[in-house]
Design a protein with these regions (language model features):
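Beta-strand/loop substructures that line and gate deep hydrophobic ligand-binding cavities in soluble
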Residues: 88-114
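Short secondary-structure transition/capping segments
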Residues: 83-95, 132-135
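Well-ordered alpha/beta subsegment
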Residues: 111-135
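Short Gly/charged-rich anion-binding patches and loops
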Residues: 26-27, 44, 77, 123, ...
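Solvent-exposed residues in well-ordered beta-strands and their adjoining turns
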Residues: 18-20, 66, 92, 103
Length: 135
């Protein structure tokens, strides 16, 4: 099984892996749990697009992940931060492989403009990077 080195985009980091889609979702869930995140929501984009628009789309899921302690810390500092929570992790199929990506919390929280959130955002990113790296 070969895996690509993690990639970084403008707003997240990802890794393409040679693991079946369903297995990648389970591995991502397990890795998130290891880092103290719970999955609060799971949105099956393929299913929703078929249901709402009647269109076919690749298999694609959004996992809404939350680390309660870090979320609480952030909410204490910025009550409206809930608009940017939870941290999304996506899993989708591409060219016969599976891509797993996580949001860059530092970039996302930078829109708030509160320097007190920088250390928490860095901590979240470290955890999410470990999730992606472990796959």
């Amino acid at each position: 099984m070969s895996a690509q080195q993690p990639q970084h985009s403008k707003y997240g980091f990802s890794k393409t892996i040679d693991v079946p889609y369903e297995e990648a979702i389970e591995k991502a869930r397990a890795a998130l749990k290891e880092e103290g995140f719970g999955v609060l929501s799971e949105i099956d984009i393929k299913e929703k697009l078929k249901e709402k628009l009647g269109v076919d789309f690749r298999r694609y899921v959004i996992l809404g992940a939350c680390n309660p302690a870090l979320a609480y810390e952030t909410l204490q500092e910025e009550i409206d931060i809930g608009l940017l929570l939870p941290c999304n992790v996506i899993v989708y199929e591409q060219d016969g492989r599976t891509v797993v990506s996580a949001v860059d919390a530092a970039k996302m929280l930078s829109v708030v403009g509160n320097p007190k959130l920088e250390s928490t955002a860095s901590m979240v990113n470290e955890k999410l990077r470990r999730v992606i790296d472990s796959l």
